[in-house]
C-alpha cells in the first residue's frame, strides 16, 4: 500500500467541526444538484463526463422505487416519473457523526432536504427504537427535526426492521434497495454516492467494517455484507463494502476526541497496517477528506489544512 495522504482539516472545537462539515455537505449537495455546466470544477481528479454518465444512470430508478417494506420513508407518492430527477445521494454512518450533523445542518437554511436520498453506510441489527440504531438515531436527532414545510422531506432508505434476526437476509434485502436506487446492477457495476460520510472508532472500524474481519474487507462483488460477532457494540450488523465506499464522488471522515488519537496516528503514519480507513484513503485517493478536532490529532504527524468555507461551486 502506498502512503496516500488525504486532505486533513483540523479544528479546535466540536462546534467548529460541525459547522465545517455542514458546509462541506451543502457544497456537495450544490455540486450534485447543479446544472452540468456549473459543475465543471466541483471535484478534482474525476472525469466529469464519466461522472455525468454515472449520475444519469443512477437517476433512472428514482428513490420512490424503494418505498414500503424494502426500507424507504419520505415524501414520495410512489408514482414513477419518466423525467429524470436530480437527487443528492448521501450515505451516513452512525455514532457521533449524527451529533455533528445535528449541530451543523439543522441551523442552515440552504439544505435542500427535499432533494436528498439518504442511505446508511451500515446498520446495527436492533429495533429502530434502540439508541444503537443508526437510522433510529438519525430519525430522532435529524429527520424528525427538519422543517419539511419549508425545506421538503428527504427520501430515506433504511433496512427492513423485520429482518434484524437474519443478517444475511437483511444485507441481501438492503442491497436490493441500493440496486433499485442506482438503476440496477445490470447497468451500474457500483453505486456512486455524491457524498459518503463516515466516522472512525477507536478500534479502527468504519461503518461496520472491522480491522480483523478480512473477508469483509476483501469483498469485491457484494454491495452490502452481513457482519456477525462484531467485537464491540451490537454483535450483528450489515455494512456497505469498501468498493462501494471508494466509488463515491466524495468520501469524508469526521473524527473527534482524544480517544481516537492513537488510531488516527496509525492510520496516517502507518498506512501499510491496512486498517479499513487506510484502504479507503488509498482506494479513493484524491476524493477523501478528514474533518478532525485537535484532540484526535494529538501527537499525529500530518499536514493540517485550514478549511475554507464555500461560496458557489469552487473548491
Swiss-Prot record:
Entry's Gene Ontology cellular component terms: cytoplasm; cytosol
Main location: cytoplasm
Residues recorded as bearing Phosphoserine in the entry: 42, 64
Keywords: Cytoplasm, Phosphoprotein
Region (Disordered): 59-85
Keyword Transmembrane helix included in the entry's annotation: no
Regions of compositional bias (Low complexity) in chain numbering: 60-70
Name of a matching Pfam family: Glucosamine_iso
InterPro entries xref list: 6-phosphogluconolactonase_DevB (IPR005900), Glc/Gal-6P_isomerase (IPR006148), NagB/RpiA_transferase-like (IPR037171), PGLS (IPR039104)
Record localization: Cytoplasm
UniProt entry tagged with the keyword Oxidoreductase: no
One of the GO BP terms on file: pentose-phosphate shunt, oxidative branch
GO terms for MF: 6-phosphogluconolactonase activity
Function summary: May be involved in regulation of tRNA subcellular distribution.
Family: Belongs to the glucosamine/galactosamine-6-phosphate isomerase family. 6-phosphogluconolactonase subfamily.
Other facts: Present with 1160 molecules/cell in log phase SD medium.
Protein name: 6-phosphogluconolactonase-like protein 2
Amino acid at each position: 500500500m502506498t502512503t496516500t495522504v488525504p486532505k486533513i482539516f483540523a479544528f479546535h472545537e466540536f462546534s467548529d467541526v460541525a459547522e465545517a462539515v455542514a458546509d462541506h455537505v451543502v457544497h456537495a449537495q450544490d455540486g450534485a444538484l447543479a446544472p452540468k455546466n456549473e459543475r465543471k470544477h466541483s471535484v478534482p481528479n474525476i472525469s466529469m463526463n464519466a461522472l455525468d454518465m454515472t449520475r444519469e444512470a443512477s437517476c433512472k430508478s428514482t428513490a420512490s422505487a424503494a418505498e414500503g417494506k424494502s426500507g424507504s420513508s419520505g415524501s414520495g407518492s410512489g408514482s414513477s416519473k419518466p423525467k429524470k430527477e436530480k437527487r443528492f445521494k448521501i450515505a451516513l454512518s452512525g455514532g457521533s457523526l449524527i451529533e455533528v450533523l445535528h449541530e451543523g445542518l439543522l441551523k442552515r437554511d440552504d439544505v435542500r432536504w427535499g432533494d436528498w436520498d439518504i442511505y446508511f453506510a451500515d446498520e446495527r441489527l436492533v429495533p429502530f427504537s434502540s439508541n444503537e440504531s443508526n437510522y433510529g438515531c438519525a430519525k430522532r436527532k435529524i429527520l424528525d427535526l427538519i422543517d419539511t414545510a419549508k425545506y421538503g422531506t428527504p427520501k430515506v432508505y433504511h433496512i427492513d426492521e423485520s429482518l434484524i434476526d437474519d443478517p444475511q437476509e437483511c444485507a441481501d434485502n438492503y442491497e436490493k434497495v441500493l440496486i433499485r436506487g442506482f438503476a440496477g446492477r445490470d447497468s451500474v457495476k457500483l453505486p456512486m454516492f455524491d457524498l459518503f460520510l463516515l466516522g472512525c472508532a477507536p478500534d479502527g472500524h468504519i461503518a461496520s467494517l472491522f480491522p480483523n474481519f478480512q473477508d469483509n474487507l476483501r469483498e469485491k462483488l457484494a454491495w452490502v455484507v452481513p457482519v456477525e460477532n462484531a467485537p464491540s457494540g451490537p454483535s450483528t450488523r450489515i455494512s456497505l463494502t469498501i468498493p462501494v465506499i471508494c466509488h463515491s464522488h466524495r468520501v469524508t471522515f469526521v473524527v473527534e476526541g482524544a480517544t481516537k488519537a492513537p488510531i488516527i496516528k496509525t492510520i496516517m503514519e502507518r498506512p501499510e497496517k491496512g486498517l479499513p480507513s487506510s484502504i479507503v484513503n488509498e482506494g479513493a485517493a484524491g476524493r477523501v477528506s478528514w474533518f478532525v478536532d485537535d484532540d484526535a490529532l494529538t501527537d499525529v504527524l500530518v499536514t493540517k489544512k485550514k478549511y475554507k468555507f464555500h461560496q458557489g461551486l469552487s473548491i
